[in-house]
Amino acid sequence: MPRPRKTRTVRTDLAVHFYKPQGIPLRDLQSVTLSLDGLEALRLADVEGLEHAAGADSMGISRPTFSRLLTEARTTVATALVEGWAIHIDGGPVAQGPALDGSACPNRRQRRGPCARRGAAGALARQTGDEPPSSPTDNEKDD
């Protein structure tokens, strides 16, 4: 008997669950299902630009599992685009994680990933393009 799938943390809040070619009724289209964890892997790797290890850490899964999810999601989206199919986003063993509003590090363990060595200020700086405040140097302290 296989072991149960590990729950994956997803921080994507969906407003839309279907994508389809314009002008064709959904009932006339073939559709493919993109899992929520696959969509999250796409978001982390392709939108946020995270490396596989950081994306896996953010989702609470192993790096090989993240890579497998990403490959499956890219294949699903590419097939739907090339064939003109609808994409239904749903399912998967997921748990809704905290929103990425820049107030905290996206992964709770700040050892790896986007907050490595810089803490939450570093993550916010990368999102906004600003540098985090630096500590004063010894020369500035003497003034």
From Swiss-Prot:
Q: Would you tell me the protein name for this molecule?
A: UPF0251 protein Rru_A1194
Q: Name one Pfam family in it.
A: DUF134
Region listing for Disordered, in residue ranges: 100-143
Q: Which InterPro entries match?
A: UPF0251
**Species:** Rhodospirillum rubrum (strain ATCC 11170 / ATH 1.1.1 / DSM 467 / LMG 4362 / NCIMB 8255 / S1)
Q: Which family does it belong to?
A: Belongs to the UPF0251 family.
* Residue ranges, compositional bias (Low complexity): 116-126
